[in-house]
Amino acid sequence: MIKFEDVSITFNTEKATVHAVRNVSFEVNKGEIFGIVGTSGAGKSTLLRTVNLLEKPNGGKVNVDGVDITLLDKQSLREARQKIGMIFQHYNLIHTKTVYKNVAFPMRISGKSAKEISKKVPELLEEVGLSDKAHVYPGQLSGGQKQRVGIARALANDSHLLLCDEPTSALDLESTKSILELIRTINKKYGITVLLISHEMDVIKSICSRVAVMSEGEVVDLNDVYSIFSNPRHEITKQLVRHSLNVEIPDGILGDTEGKIVKVLYRGSSALNPILSNAIRKYPVDMNILHGRIEYIDNQPMGVLLVNINGENNDVVNLIHYLKENTATAEVIHD
């Protein structure tokens, strides 16, 4: 569906040449929800905007449905863009037009008839839950409702690809949840491919099947979302995952804790097994759970626990070895 081949983008400033995207190569499969995550300045938005050529690469290819979009003439590019919907962080609605006219706008630009528009727009507004808002203006809507208008507008020309540029970063938690659920529903119902960027791992975790992690213009990690969370490989990925899982203990608590503190990661079936209770029955140690959580990512369980272990040194060593053998990882983080 989308194939980035050695894509690079540079910007020349008075002081230096900025390498916004560096030699990026990966594919997005048809019908999937694919995420790109990274901190500010990682190159996420710049890369996303190459798909509809709002940013033109200095090098490499961007193939959409087998066509290198960077080589299209103006007319062919206009036609290609009609099938690529885009939603933005700050909605980009026309504030002097009603919700109905905002959704109808791309249809008018593409030459659709008044009959086609009058049939399609109400269907789209019903799809996004805004049938009763057709004749109000954007200024009268909440942030979540504005983004729903943006989604309806992005689908107006029967897009087969939806680009989502930080679609929830300006929303509260409840609106974020509802917008992500709407995107997921549209993806499943119509088979639309979704390429979504975010700086929030929680957004990626809740909706994407695969994710590319970007840092300083490069893709430093790429995997299915469950593997990214349960087995992050790059240090940037590890930092993002740690921040998302938020399994931390204040330094003051660490300083007052005797014995070893072990971070235990459970993956798959091990997250549901009574490993800790088996361990303390097997070895005569005292164990206290300091922090922990179990999550379901892509319908697969993953658990993280921080446990404090006290006892005879040999028993503690043997118990930690037992944990390492029966969980994904067990790491002493404080001794």
What are these regions (language model features)?
Residues 69-85, 109, 228-232:
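ABC ATPase NBD coupling module
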Residues 67-68, 104, 108, 115-132:
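Conserved ABC ATPase "signature" region
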Residues 60-68:
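Conserved ABC transporter NBD signature motif
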Residues 97-104:
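Short coil-to-helix segment of the ABC ATPase nucleotide-binding domain corresponding to the Q-loop/switch region
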Residues 136-139, 157, 164:
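Conserved signature/switch motifs of ABC ATPase nucleotide-binding domains
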Residues 52:
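Helix-to-loop junction immediately C-terminal to a conserved catalytic motif
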